[in-house]
């Protein structure tokens, strides 16, 4: 997200077999709490849908309650570890949203 040439936040979606993984969402500290992360996540979801993906998945840290709350507000639910992530990682939260 960029406004008047100022970068407020970034995000990335990596395509896998049938799903997209949200790889990063970062919002500049001075822009947090203004809907920037939601806008980025919504843009990534539109991209996933345009690619014909059936789900979006992500991994975030257990000590990131604001991120977890954002993802839950946007329809993500807790899921099992996926891809190359280790099962039982005590520091990770895995989430997915069916599209």
Q: Predicted regions span which residues?
A:
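Residue-level signal for short amphipathic helical patches enriched in basic/charged
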Residues: 17, 51, 59
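C-terminal "cap" of GNAT-fold acetyltransferases
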Residues: 54-57, 61-99
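Short coil/turn segments at alpha/beta junctions that flank glycine-rich nucleotide-binding fingerprints
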Residues: 34, 50-54
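Structured loop/turn residues at beta-strand edges in well-structured enzyme cores
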Residues: 6, 51, 77
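Acetyl-CoA-dependent GNAT
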Residues: 1-23, 28-30, 41-43, 47, ...
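Active-site acidic-Proline motif in GNAT/NAT acetyltransferases
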Residues: 28-30, 34, 62
């Amino acid at each position: 997200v960029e406004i008047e040439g100022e970068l407020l936040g970034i995000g990335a979606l990596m395509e896998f077999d049938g799903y997209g993984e949200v790889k990063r969402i970062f919002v500049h500290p001075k822009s947090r709490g203004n809907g920037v992360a939601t806008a980025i996540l919504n843009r990534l979801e539109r991209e996933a849908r345009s690619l014909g993906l059936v789900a979006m998945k992500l991994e975030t840290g257990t000590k990131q309650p604001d991120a977890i709350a954002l993802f839950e507000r946007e329809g993500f639910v807790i899921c099992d570890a996926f891809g190359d992530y280790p099962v039982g990682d005590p520091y990770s939260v895995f989430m997915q949203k069916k599209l």
